[in-house]
Amino acid sequence: MLDVKEITDSIFKLDKRIRYVAILNHQYGLVESRMREGVASLTPAQTDRDFMTLAAPLMVGSAEKLRPFCGAIRRLAVRYDKVLLVFYRTAAHLVVLSLEPHAEQALLDRIGDSVRKLELASGEGGAEKGE
């Protein structure tokens, strides 16, 4: 069974353009926050943590309000000049990645499929303890 750190390591192995991985539980509590080794963050660490715990619930929660009408969210992406942020909702977590800004659609699909498979392999396909 994979733990959160092993899932993060596996996500980094998917593509060298993945700069950062954050994993949040369904209450948007930050479980993991890690930059790729050797990659400099564009933002201070505290800003990253604040963004994940404040902005992620607002952005994803707002988008999920359309779920009954439009279906499940595959991913939510925000493209900045210098970085691409991608949010993937899984059964047990919200996985947030930052990538190099010109990542193509096919790569985002492949990463999303892999993130979901990794989580299933971890045995965390259901709700977390305490949720």
Segments from the language model and where they lie:
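Non-catalytic interaction/Regulatory regions outside core domains
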Residues: M1-E131
